[in-house]
């Protein structure tokens, strides 16, 4: 797999679980001898939802809820077959969305 690059994009609602998952990926990739760039923090996506508290009237009484999606990017340069096998066997915490591009 010479001159290849693996780009891993992580998403999660909780930044601590995201950071532990990124640390596990970086640690397993460096242990197998690949060069790692990252984790690079990407902009946090913020969704704001406004809901009327009452069921029928009282439109002035509203409540706002916020959902933040934290993102990280990891590039693995020149991965070996050991690196790919280690990434496939890696156990990541639940709640982390992983997208891998070769």
UniProtKB/Swiss-Prot annotation:
GO terms for cellular component: ribonucleoprotein complex; ribosome. This is Small ribosomal subunit protein uS10. SMART domains: Ribosomal_S10. Pfam families: Ribosomal_S10 (PF00338). Part of the 30S ribosomal subunit. Belongs to the universal ribosomal protein uS10 family. InterPro entries: Ribosomal_uS10 (IPR001848), Ribosomal_uS10_CS (IPR018268), Ribosomal_uS10_dom (IPR027486), Ribosomal_uS10_dom_sf (IPR036838). One of its GO terms (biological process) is translation.
